[in-house]
């Protein structure tokens, strides 16, 4: 089968279409004939040599895909060949065929295009896991999400809008802030012109937010902690702004704050199954009824994966970048 491969770590130019062996599903696996695959920041890091796949995972890029079930393992009874599905992957999405654990597969809603389905699993499940499961977001609470125009950010806005959670976001331009507000954010802070810590204090009358979802890391740590309400939770899912920072632990102790690091890719199949189950239990009706959908920025053919990576690296995108495969 055809897939995007690279012989050595490097910039976007190392990506090329190559022939690789067709993957075979295990007893609890589903094989998908891929129609579309989402592009995520982790793909760029892996291409650069900084984020290797977990043991046993495909070395092919791609943490989510959508398409039609092509084959199922002997112990899979809940999903049938021929069904349209979207799946969370540990790797392998940039290919004509991909294998996913059955527990990480969701049926594609009738109204979704292939591009929307391919853009959905990784970012919506990341936002759900970290805001709703780990940080306990619920109606009446307030959260801050950095990178409101990213795939995770736009997904978080959609989930919070559906759950009546007040959501503030940061974004890097007036235009992105406007689009975040159009999606349903309660406040959008242009981090290039505004101090998000001060904005949070003003908008919460000094209380702070109950949870923060952050992909920046070190550069934002002190200001994130200062922006939390009593017993608030900071969930860090990336380190784009550095991995090291100094922090006054007295503030954590005095305000009983939690700082948690979180990833999705390396979790066990059992963990991912439970995350999908919990997501569908909480938001399945909204998904089926068309109240949840990803914001798709752009769609590139598979052979232009390098251009898709350049688009993401530029920071100009709003929402998800998708590869059209089938």
Can you say where each PLM-predicted feature lies in the sequence?
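Adenosine-nucleotide cofactor-binding segment
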Residues: 161-223, 272-275
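Mid-domain Rossmann-like dinucleotide-binding core that forms the NAD(H)/NADP(H) cofactor-binding site
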Residues: 119-193
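NAD(P)H cofactor-binding loop motif with strongest signal on the N-terminal glycine-rich segment
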Residues: 147-148, 216, 239
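C-terminal capping/lid region of NAD(P)-dependent oxidoreductase domains
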Residues: 1-4, 289-298, 306-326
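Short glycine-centered segments of the SAM/dcSAM-binding site in methyltransferase folds
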Residues: 84, 142, 166, 232-233, ...
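Glycine-rich phosphate-binding loop and adjacent beta-alpha segment
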Residues: 171, 219-291, 324-326
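NAD(P)H dinucleotide-binding glycine-rich loop of Rossmann-like/cofactor-binding domains
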Residues: 45, 78, 84-147
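Glycine-rich beta-strand-centered segment in the early N-terminal region that forms part
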Residues: 21-38, 50-92
């Amino acid at each position: 089968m055809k897939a995007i491969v690279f012989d050595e770590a490097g910039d976007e130019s190392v990506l090329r279409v190559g022939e690789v062996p067709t993957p075979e599903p295990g007893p609890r696996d589903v094989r998908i004939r891929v129609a579309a695959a989402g592009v995520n920041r982790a793909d760029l890091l892996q291409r650069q040599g900084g984020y290797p796949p977990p043991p046993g995972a495909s070395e092919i890029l791609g943490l989510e895909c959508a398409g039609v079930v092509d084959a199922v393992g002997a112990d899979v009874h809940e999903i049938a060949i021929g069904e349209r599905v979207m799946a969370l992957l540990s790797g392998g999405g940039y290919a004509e065929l991909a294998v996913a654990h059955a527990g990480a597969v969701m049926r594609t809603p009738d109204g979704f295009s292939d591009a929307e389905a391919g853009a959905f699993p990784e970012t919506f499940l990341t936002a759900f896991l970290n805001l709703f499961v780990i940080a306990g977001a619920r109606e009446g609470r307030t959260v801050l999400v950095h990178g409101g125009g990213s795939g995770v950010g736009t997904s978080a806005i959609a989930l919070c809008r559906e759950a009546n959670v007040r959501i503030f976001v940061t974004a890097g331009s007036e235009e992105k802030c406007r689009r975040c507000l159009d999606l349903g954010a309660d406040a959008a802070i242009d981090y290039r012109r505004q101090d998000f810590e001060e904005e949070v204090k003003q908008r919460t009358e000094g209380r702070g937010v109950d949870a923060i979802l952050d992909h920046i890391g070190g550069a934002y740590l002190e200001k994130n902690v200062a922006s939390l309400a009593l017993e608030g939770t900071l969930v860090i899912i990336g380190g784009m702004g550095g991995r090291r920072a100094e922090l006054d632990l007295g503030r954590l102790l005095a305000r009983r704050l939690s700082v948690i690091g979180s990833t999705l890719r390396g979790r066990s199949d059992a963990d991912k199954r439970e995350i999908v189950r919990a997501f569908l239990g909480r938001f399945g009706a909204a998904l089926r009824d068309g109240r949840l959908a990803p914001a798709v920025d752009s769609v590139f053919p598979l052979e232009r994966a390098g251009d898709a990576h350049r688009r993401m690296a530029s920071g100009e995108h709003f929402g998800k970048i998708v590869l059209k495969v089938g």
